[in-house]
Each structure stands twice: as structure tokens, then as C-alpha cells.
Amino acid sequence: MKKIILNTVVAGFTAVSLQAGTFSLSAPLTTDASTGISAANTYTHTVSGGLPATVNGVVFADQSPDTTVPNFTWTSASKNDINNNANAWVAATGGVTGAGLISLLNSFTYAGGGADPGATQRFSLAGLTVGTIYDTRLYIRMWDPGGSGRPIDFKFTHGSETNSISGLEDRPGTVLGTGNNHQAFYLNYRFTSLATTLDIDATVPAAAAAGSGSFHMFGLSNQVIPEPSSLTLALALGLIGIGRRRR
């Protein structure tokens, strides 16, 4: 098992990869356009915790304790949501101005009885196609500037492949290396699916303080990444060949 710090800028998240899936972090999200969410993308899942939201014409379906989303399962010993509540987060301080983005980040689900070390929530995305490349994104902002920082261990599993990453959900400024905890961002997991289901486990670390806090699920998307066309590959290989001959 190889432990990888993504880079010095995003040292707030540490990844452990057993196979080929890769993690990355967005730049701070500001406008709706900055999210990369687009009706031109092909999505298998767009899920909003607590209340539905629409960003750039893409509808994020409401996942709450009383509702379900097709091909999406939330498993938790306890289920709660908080709606239209920014708490200590000040969007303007973080440069967040997009109305759709703010709507997505203003509500979330969480495990009310799962704030202690070892407590886990699972989010399962069904209906995937084996061999297809996907980007799964978790949209994140802070809730509480004090306390533990809300450390979370994430584990992404599809078939025989498991990739893990850990970080402080309530400390975007640490994660992004900017020092501004009011910023928002997304965690991206790119993988070639080995199964028809992706399971995402969000666990309060064993070393966390009692009552550290469960994962807040504001929004999630899973989009298809098209394979490069044969023409694109041919052009790329041709350019590589030209570059080698010129050396």
C-alpha cells in the first residue's frame, strides 16, 4: 500500500491508492461556471443532500432521510438533514457567488448519531458500465470553523479496486492551501469502472476526538468521461513522433 500526498498545495488531503483510480481537487469554486457542471456532460448521478438544486441547468435530485434517488443508496445507522442553513459559512468571504452553487451547498445530509470515531456512511452508485471512465465529485464547504475540523476517511470501491483519501471537511483553507476556510471545492475521483456499482464510504477516523462530526453530503455528481477518438489518438501519437524526430 503506497501513501501519496497529492502535492504541497493540497496537503490537507492524503490519498492511498491500491490501483489505478486517481484523486484531484478543484480550484476554489466561485461562479456556477467554475463548477464545471454542464448540461453538455453525460451524468449517471447528480445528487443533492437535503433539498434539490439546479446548477447550470443540471438538476441535482433530493436525497434526504425521507426520499430516495434512482440507482443511489445512502446507508447509515442514523439519517438526518439540515436545509437552507449556512451556519458559520459565509459564501461571499469565500468568493462564492453562483446562485446554483450556493443552493447546492446550503443543504446537506449527515449521520446524526454517527459523529464518533468509527462511524460510517455509505453512498452507493448503481447502474454503472464496466470499462467506462467516470469522474465522481463531492462538493464541499465548511460548517464549523472550530472543533475538530471534521476529519473524514473516504474509501471508493468498485469491484476489486479500492482507493482511499482522508482530509478535513471543515477546513477548505487547509485542503486547498489558501488559508480561506470559507472557500468551496470539489474532490474528484477518476476511475475506469470494474463493476456496475461504486461504493463510497465516509468514516470518522478512529483517531478522531469523540463527537468529531460525521460527513456532510452537500452534493455529488458522477459523469462519463468520453474515450479519446481514434483520430485524436492518431494525432497525439503523430505529434509525439514529430517531437522525437526533432530532438
Where are these regions (language model features)?
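Sec/Tat signal peptide C-region and signal peptidase I cleavage site
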Residues: 16-20
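A short beta-strand element within beta-rich, extracytoplasmic domains
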Residues: 128-144
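Surface-exposed, low-complexity/disordered Ser/Thr/Gly/Pro/Asn-rich loops and linkers
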Residues: 58-126
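A short, hydrophobic C-terminal helix/tail in secreted or cell-surface proteins
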Residues: 227-244
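Sec-dependent signal peptide recognition
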Residues: 2-11, 229-233
